[in-house]
């Protein structure tokens, strides 16, 4: 029994301590509830803090949890953020056991909150799963921290003159909807450098690199007063990889393929025609597909200029073959006319060839005469030996020599136009590429954002 007494004493002490803790917990919760009830008693959430007196200052900062995607066609972007606002309400000062009271979203509806809205937002969503994603903290000096999780779809004006070597500054503008700057002003809580945080893992962009962000504030005038507008610029630089693979490389290869026809014999009309028509159709298809990922802007982009020049080279190669074929036919016809003009005129038949008739008298033992006429073009066959002797005594007529057929000058081989084109076309295309890439890659294509502090 003596040994059990210490253990009984320890058990009783622990039970007493636990009861004290429970009493303190109940007292703490009852005290906090009493504090909140006292704060809300007579509180009018229709009036801003300092109504009729000092200007209410709302400090803001943004934490981006997900940035993207960015749509070029719609000129908009989407991001998921924690939007934080901090202000001081003198009516909510308290003294109690805790310096900070962490409360749920039910408290938000009972106090005054800023009427912040996004000026260039197309669609914004406040997340409510599984409960409204809102954080509310109240400090003893009346300072309030109010955080919401939002998905914002905002407008991003783009000028695509340098596409696809372009960069854009997509803004996010917000401010008070109803209160002018004489009643509410917005400031950056952590200063202009650290008030907007975008972790590297938050960016989920396929065609862009998020290279940074800048903040600014400005005052705009309207019929209802002057309002303070806070702006965040997200600087995006487009990636070139996709367009190099899908557009630029096929265009360059098509132009090179069109110039292969300069090395094909000019007499191979079907082969060169197929080269020309195929490359022209290919360039047409590439130009159409390149526009699918762009809005229907009224000006030419950098890629449009490149495709247009490539199309001009391909079309010029087809025109070059038409010129070669035309001048080849012209040369052939001219050579034929010259050959006909330079030919020897036909020789007139001599009297001997027309009227000369040889009379051969053949004597035989039967004492009769046989006369036979032969022309100068045929030689008779006389079986008689005496006739052969008589024929041998007859003078031999020489036939008129026949001139050989006329030979036209050869029109095959390589045309001088082809010879010049083999050099001029590749050199001109290489020079164009050199100038094009130097100009656009060395150019600062990032859009300048206004930073009025």
UniProtKB/Swiss-Prot annotation:
The chain crosses the membrane at residues 244-264, 271-290, 305-325, 423-443. Pfam families: Neur_chan_LBD, Neur_chan_memb. InterPro entries: GABAA/Glycine_rcpt, GABAAa_rcpt, GABBAa6_rcpt, Gabra-1-6_TM, Neur_chan_lig-bd, Neur_chan_lig-bd_sf, Neur_channel, Neuro-gated_channel_TM_sf. Expressed in brain, in cerebellar granule cells. The modification Phosphoserine is found at residue 375. Glycans are attached at residues 31, 128, 141. Residues 265-270, 326-422 are cytoplasmic. Disulfide bonds join 156-170. GABAARs subunits share a common topological structure: a peptide sequence made up of a long extracellular N-terminal, four transmembrane domains, intracellular or cytoplasmic domain located between the third and the fourth transmembrane domains. This is Gamma-aminobutyric acid receptor subunit alpha-6. It comes from Mus musculus.
């Amino acid at each position: 029994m003596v040994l059990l007494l210490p253990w009984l004493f320890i058990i009783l002490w622990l039970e007493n301590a636990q009861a004290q803790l429970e009493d303190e917990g109940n007292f703490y919760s009852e005290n906090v509830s009493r504090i909140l009830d006292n704060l809300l008693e007579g509180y009018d959430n229709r009036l801003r803090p300092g109504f009729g007196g000092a200007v209410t200052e709302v400090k803001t900062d943004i934490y981006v949890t997900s940035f993207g995607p960015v749509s070029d066609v719609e000129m908009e972007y989407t991001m998921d953020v924690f939007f934080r606002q901090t202000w001081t309400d003198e009516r909510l000062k308290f003294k109690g056991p805790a310096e900070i009271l962490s409360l749920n979203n039910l408290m938000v509806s009972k106090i005054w909150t800023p009427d912040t809205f996004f000026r260039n937002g197309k669609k914004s969503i406040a997340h409510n799963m599984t409960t409204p994603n809102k954080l509310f903290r109240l400090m003893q000096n009346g300072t309030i921290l109010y955080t919401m999780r939002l998905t914002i779809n905002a407008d991003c004006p783009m000028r695509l003159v340098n596409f696809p070597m372009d960069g854009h500054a997509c803004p996010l503008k917000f401010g008070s909807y109803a209160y002018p700057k004489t009643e509410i002003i917005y400031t950056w809580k952590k200063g202009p450098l650290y008030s907007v945080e975008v972790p590297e893992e938050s960016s989920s962009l396929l065609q862009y690199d998020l290279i940074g962000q800048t903040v600014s504030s400005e005052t705009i005038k309207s019929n209802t007063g002057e309002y303070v507008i806070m702006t965040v610029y997200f600087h995006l630089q487009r990636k070139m990889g996709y367009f190099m693979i899908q557009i630029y490389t096929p265009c360059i290869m098509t132009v090179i393929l069109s110039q292969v026809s300069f090395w094909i014999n000019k007499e191979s009309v079907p082969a060169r025609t197929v080269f020309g028509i195929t490359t022209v159709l290919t360039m047409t298809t590439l130009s159409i597909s390149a526009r699918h990922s762009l809005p229907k802007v009224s000006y030419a982009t950098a890629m449009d200029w490149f495709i247009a020049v490539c199309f001009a080279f391909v079309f010029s190669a087809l025109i070059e073959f038409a010129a070669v074929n035309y001048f080849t036919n012209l040369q052939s016809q001219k050579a034929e006319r010259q050959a006909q003009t330079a030919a020897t005129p036909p020789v007139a038949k001599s009297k001997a060839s027309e009227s000369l008739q040889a009379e051969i008298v053949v004597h035989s033992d039967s004492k009769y005469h046989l006369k036979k006429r032969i022309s100068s073009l045929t030689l008779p066959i006389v079986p008689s030996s005496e006739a052969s002797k008589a024929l041998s005594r007859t003078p031999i007529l020489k036939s008129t020599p026949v001139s050989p057929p006329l030979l036209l000058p050869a029109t095959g081989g390589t045309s001088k136009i082809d010879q010049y084109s083999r050099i001029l076309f590749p050199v001109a295309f290489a020079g164009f590429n050199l100038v094009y890439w130097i100009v656009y890659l060395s150019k600062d294509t990032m859009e300048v954002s206004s930073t009025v502090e």
